């Protein structure tokens, strides 16, 4: 059993055309610097197209985003990640206000008045530790990670450690957004 890193309250508001979601969390005393804070959605694999309004159109992180324009971008989910020899996180997009995943006939959208980061991937980040070498097998699902906060990449391997402003150090974190599922 894994002990939660945060005490949190998750609220849903059901409307005619959307579900409003708000999350408030307080970090537990023993937690230092988690890699990210957000929610994970598991969708059917057929949600394989992504359109978003945010930084892009390549992966970016809080400390690796400043040369990229905020605009509207479209990608295949399978093309939004980099396959490293040693499995690790990739494909994050920052400063987003909207992300939509599409199947042939449906759309799953997240819209927020506040910037968030997201990752759309056929891999579950929880599986990375199980593999010492490149992950060949995908989940058979589309995973959508919505992050209120995420840690920067840094350069500790060959330079200075990650600056504190790019770490998840907040004692309390809030995020809110609307979920919309509709026909395409």
Where are the model-predicted features located?
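Beta-strand/loop-rich accessory regions of lumenal/periplasmic or secreted enzymes
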Residues: 1-184
């Amino acid at each position: 059993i894994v002990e939660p890193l945060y005490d949190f309250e998750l609220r849903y508001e059901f409307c005619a055309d959307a579900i409003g979601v708000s999350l408030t969390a307080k970090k537990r005393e023993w937690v230092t610097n988690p890699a990210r804070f957000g929610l994970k959605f598991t969708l059917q694999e057929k949600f394989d197209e992504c359109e978003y309004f945010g930084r892009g159109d390549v992966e970016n992180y809080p400390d690796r985003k400043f040369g990229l324009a905020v605009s509207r971008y479209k990608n295949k989910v399978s093309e939004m990640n980099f396959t490293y020899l040693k499995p690790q996180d990739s494909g994050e997009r920052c400063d987003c206000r909207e992300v939509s995943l599409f199947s042939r006939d449906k759309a799953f959208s997240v819209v927020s008045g506040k910037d968030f980061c997201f990752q759309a991937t056929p891999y579950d980040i929880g599986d990375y530790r199980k593999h010492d070498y490149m992950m060949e097998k995908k989940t058979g699902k589309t995973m959508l990670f919505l992050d209120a906060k995420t840690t920067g990449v840094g350069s500790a391997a060959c330079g200075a450690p990650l600056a504190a402003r790019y770490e998840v150090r907040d004692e309390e974190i809030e995020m809110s957004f609307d979920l919309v599922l509709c026909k395409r």
